[in-house]
Amino acid sequence: MTGQSAAVEGSNSALPWYRMGFHTLAEFNTYVTFVLLGMSIMMVTSAVTSAPDFVTKYFIYATGDPDAVAETPLFWNNANTFYNAGTYAMQVVTEIASLTPFMRSIPLGIRLFLGLGIPFVELVVIIAVPAATIPTQNGAIAVIMVVAMMGGLSKALCDSCTNALVGPFPTKFMNGAQWGLTVIALFMSIIQIILQVSMGSTFQDVLTISRIYFGIGIGIQVMAIAALVLLRYNPFAQKYIAEFRAAALRRRGHVEPEESQDSKEPATGDVAEAPKAGEKEVTLDAMEEADEVRAVPSDAFVAKSGAVLQATGDADRMVDLDQTKNITSTEQMLRASVWSVFKRIYPMLLCAFTIFFTTLLVFPGVFFLVPARSGWYMTIIVTLFNAGDFVARVLLMIRVLRPSPKLVIVGTFGRLAVIPLIVLCVRGFIPGVALPYVLIFLFGLTNGYFGTMSCIHCPRTPTLHYAGERSVAAMLAGISLMLGLCFGSNMSLAITLTY
């Protein structure tokens, strides 16, 4: 390390973001933006799931009748499961469509801003209907399902675009987006508990709580949109997001001819800083991801089936060869072969599907079937799951605690041991709520730990060499996750309806 670089490091060490592993404020702001985007993906779903009593009794508030009795108990007793099924069904269809050439040709910014805007309509509808009231409970059912379908569309747009944006970034940024998914869930659960404790449980109190609760959700969406707007002008983000980099070049009037986007071959080049010959690498910490990039040997470009399991090296030290000048993100993705990417990462895609399938298979539906006398049972179950998920994703911020792809496979099937135990609780063979509380925390912990890493290993594998491939890999991970959630929630619906 030279005297000059040591002096720079010494002057930066006092900065708060440097102590957290970020070398510049722009880098830290990029990380925060991805956390907010992750939060926005799950914001409405987390808000609805964290207020199970409000949803299952929505017909009371929507009709304005405190004494109303459910006319369709089959739906209202399983309202959360119906909501999840509708949301995930719509989401998986939209996410699959996002891989088509037509959808990939639409700029990421346009799709993402649309996805961030839809939740405003969802939350306003949820709040406005009880304020205006509707005459029938069937109308309340329609509101729940319309909000679910809109939520699925919004989540798909936000999820696929966020994955495409974060895929080329170093691993810690994708972990930040994944962390945001659980931060919002835990945050909304805590807010719901605070509101329930601090306010009453009368008809009017619940309406007031819902307005405060969902109003907070609207505020979070505003923050995410503002952060995304600023991200377009962030020099660190422009280094990895081709669309933002090309826009910056156009603003400066530096538009250079680029290859036609019809080209099937990835562009080559390097806009990220690489070390000069003979220069030693300088890292902030031995365990921290390096921001510098490295070229890869030519013999590593063979697309082998399941290569993610045998991959060696560190993707964060590799150069993405299509990060060139004014190429856009859509051009990068159109040049990537979806099938070639799928072949290399399919073991992690299967893990993502299995983990989230089993999660939605028993949570929240089957856990809610446990005979419990406490009116707090459902709220505590949701909070404990979110807490376990949150803790797991925090642990993954520490590099040495991240499991390898092979360990992810072991964890994926090991967590299935929770299912027979919760079935025994539902059937009454194991009485009380103590064991369900322990099981749901462990289920959330393994969901966050192995589920997150299965998604991270998809784009952040050394077997991929282009930013377009990493974006597609991250989108495939999102689709596998959504397929698991969709099939799991629908299977859970079938179980709870026949119980």
UniProtKB/Swiss-Prot annotation:
SUPFAM superfamilies: MFS general substrate transporter (SSF103473)
Keywords: Cell membrane, Cell projection, Cilium, Flagellum, Glycoprotein, Membrane, Transmembrane, Transmembrane helix, Transport
Residues modified by glycosylation: N326
Transmembrane segments: 31-51, 112-132, 133-153, 179-199, 212-232, 350-370, 378-398, 406-426, 428-448, 475-495
Membrane topology term: Multi-pass membrane protein
A single GO cellular-component term on record: plasma membrane
Topology, Cytoplasmic side: 1-30
Composition-biased stretches (Basic and acidic residues): 255-267
Main location: membrane
Disruption phenotype: Gene knockout results in a reduced ability of parasites to transport inosine. Increased adenosine transport. Increased resistance to formycin B, a toxic inosine analog. No proliferation of promastigotes in medium with xanthosine as the sole purine nutrient. Abolished xanthosine transport. No significant effects on the transformation of promastigotes to axenic and intracellular amastigotes. No significant effects on the ability of parasites to infect and maintain an infection in mouse cells.
Consequence of substituting D389E: Reduces transport of inosine and guanosine. Moderately reduces sensitivity to formycin B. No significant effects on protein localization to cell membrane
Entries under Pfam families matching the protein: Nucleoside_tran
Region (Disordered) residue spans: 255-276
Signal peptide interval: none
GO MF assignments: nucleoside transmembrane transporter activity
Outcome (variant: S189T): Reduces transport of inosine and guanosine. Reduces affinity for inosine and guanosine. No significant effects on sensitivity to formycin B. No significant effects on protein localization to cell membrane
Reaction(s) the record says it catalyses: inosine(in) + H(+)(in) = inosine(out) + H(+)(out); guanosine(in) + H(+)(in) = guanosine(out) + H(+)(out); xanthosine(in) + H(+)(in) = xanthosine(out) + H(+)(out)
Locations listed in the record: Cell membrane; Cell projection, Cilium, Flagellum
Result of altering N175I: No significant effects on inosine and guanosine transport. No significant effects on protein localization to cell membrane
Further remarks about this protein from its record: Can transport formycin B, a toxic inosine analog, but not tubercidin, a toxic adenosine analog.
Similarity comment text for this entry: Belongs to the SLC29A/ENT transporter (TC 2.A.57) family.
Function recorded in the entry: High affinity nucleoside:H(+) symporter; transports inosine and guanosine. Can transport xanthosine.
UniProt protein name: Nucleoside transporter 2
Source lineage: Eukaryota, Discoba, Euglenozoa, Kinetoplastea, Metakinetoplastina
Name of the encoding gene: NT2
